[in-house]
Each structure stands twice: as structure tokens, then as C-alpha cells.
From Swiss-Prot:
Name of the featured protein: Large ribosomal subunit protein uL15
Record family assignment: Belongs to the universal ribosomal protein uL15 family.
SUBUNIT field: Part of the 50S ribosomal subunit.
Gly residues bias (residue ranges): 23-33
Organism: Xylella fastidiosa (strain Temecula1 / ATCC 700964)
Keyword field: Ribonucleoprotein, Ribosomal protein, RNA-binding, rRNA-binding
BP-aspect Gene Ontology terms: translation
Region called Disordered, residue ranges: 16-63
Domain of life: Bacteria
């Protein structure tokens, strides 16, 4: 006899039939059908509690104060590490050239140079922000900033 997909079945004793609840005392799962007496878990759709619900007690997210916010300018600004500028050709750099060099993601609306590592080439940065340390390093190599 060959084995076919439509002939497959579990081995004997490997599976048992579904327990039918609420079918009399003798079954062991009669009357309350294994749900106990009253309460939300005894009801249909019971046990589906909203996240954060604490049984009527004021929930934690309402007890704690509202603080802070997430600045959109941080989300829209891409940080460019200063040593990565050395991979570019010396000269003028603007936001578009940083995007072409894939130093800035497409979601960013502006860029900021952050000091990290060393810089050897001279750059003129147009319309790009920088930290104080990065500005000092770029100006020390002979570079400049234009707004």
C-alpha cells in the first residue's frame, strides 16, 4: 500500500476527541461547563480585559503625571558624523549632496554635523547645522559655514 496525502491520519491514541461541555453532571463538565460560578470569566466573551484595566482601580497610566514630548525636529534631523565627510570630495557640501552620498536618510528634512574622529579635507558647508565641536574642527581644517 502506498502512502498518499489524502490517506494520512494521526496514529492510534495520538489524538482525543473534543471535550463536550455542559452535557450533564456525569461528564464532569456539566452545569457550569468548567467556567466556575459568576464573574467575567463565566460569561460569554469573558476574560477579554482591556490592556491597562485594573478592575475599576484607577489605572497606572492615569495615576502617573503626563510629562515631556517627542520633538519633531529631532525626528526630522539626521546626524552626520564628521569623519564620514572625509569620504566626500573636498569643496561645497549642501543637504542634497549629503543625501546623494547616502549619509542622510530620505526621511530627514535637515542634517547636523556631529564631531567624531578626525577631518583632513576642507569643506564649505551650506545650510547645514553643526555642533560647536564639529564647527571648530571644520574651521580648524580651513573649512567654513554658509547659511
Amino acid at each position: 500500500m502506498s502512502l498518499r496525502l489524502n490517506d494520512l491520519k494521526p496514529a492510534l491514541g495520538a489524538s482525543s476527541s473534543r471535550a463536550r461541555v455542559g452535557r450533564g453532571i456525569g461528564s464532569g463538565l456539566g452545569k457550569t461547563a468548567g467556567r466556575g460560578h459568576k464573574g467575567s470569566f463565566a460569561r460569554k466573551g469573558g476574560g477579554k480585559i482591556k490592556p491597562g484595566f485594573e478592575g475599576g482601580q484607577t489605572p497606572m497610566q492615569r495615576r502617573l503625571p503626563k510629562i515631556g514630548f517627542r520633538s519633531r525636529s529631532v525626528a526630522n534631523t539626521a546626524e552626520v558624523l564628521s569623519y564620514k565627510l572625509d569620504n566626500l570630495e573636498p569643496g561645497e557640501i549642501d543637504f542634497a549632496s549629503l543625501r546623494l552620498a547616502k549619509l542622510v536618510p530620505s526621511t530627514a528634512k535637515k542634517a547636523k554635523i556631529v564631531k567624531k574622529g578626525r577631518l583632513t579635507k576642507v569643506f564649505v558647508l551650506k545650510g547645514i547645522e553643526s555642533t560647536a565641536g564639529a564647527r571648530a574642527m571644520i574651521e580648524a581644517t580651513g573649512g567654513s559655514f554658509q547659511e
